[in-house]
């Protein structure tokens, strides 16, 4: 009876260790993905790049990211691209073509479609709206 109890406890502890390792592996993958996407989102827009770098399948990466953030990998990449585009539109005089190039788009038209799909406005409309707001704030 004592041996059986000991084996049950050993089995229980080994399962807890495996679960802990799985959790920490998922946390590690999520941290590594975050570091990779923060460094590479301007050039790399595809899930396959990040999965390859992490040596895991795209599906596994998608599950880990969704479980950890509530968002898809593509959503995270797109949010970072939009945030960077807004920053460049508001703080530089770069052309839309130059911004498109900096953000890894092959042409300005593709970037404009992407920006409008994600913000509801064209890049130039966004920039013009900011300039109007700045001008209004100066008049107050």
Describe these PLM feature segments.
Residues 1-2, 35:
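Amphipathic alpha-helical segments enriched in hydrophobic/aromatic residues interleaved with Lys/Arg
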Residues 67-109, 128-140:
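Terminal helix-turn-helix DNA-binding modules in bacterial transcription factors
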């Amino acid at each position: 009876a004592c041996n059986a109890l000991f084996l049950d406890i050993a089995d229980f502890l080994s399962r807890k260790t495996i679960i802990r390792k799985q959790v920490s592996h998922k946390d590690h993958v999520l941290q590594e993905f975050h570091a990779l996407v923060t460094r590479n989102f301007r050039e790399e827009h595809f899930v396959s790049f990040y999965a390859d770098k992490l040596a895991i399948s795209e599906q596994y990466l998608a599950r880990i990211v969704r479980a950890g953030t509530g968002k898809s990998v593509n959503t995270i990449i797109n949010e970072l691209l939009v945030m960077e585009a807004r920053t460049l539109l508001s703080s530089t005089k770069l052309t839309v073509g130059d911004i498109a190039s900096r953000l890894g788009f092959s042409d300005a038209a593709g970037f404009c479609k992407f920006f409008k799909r994600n913000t509801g406005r064209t890049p130039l409309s966004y920039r013009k709206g900011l300039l109007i707001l700045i001008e209004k704030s100066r008049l107050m």
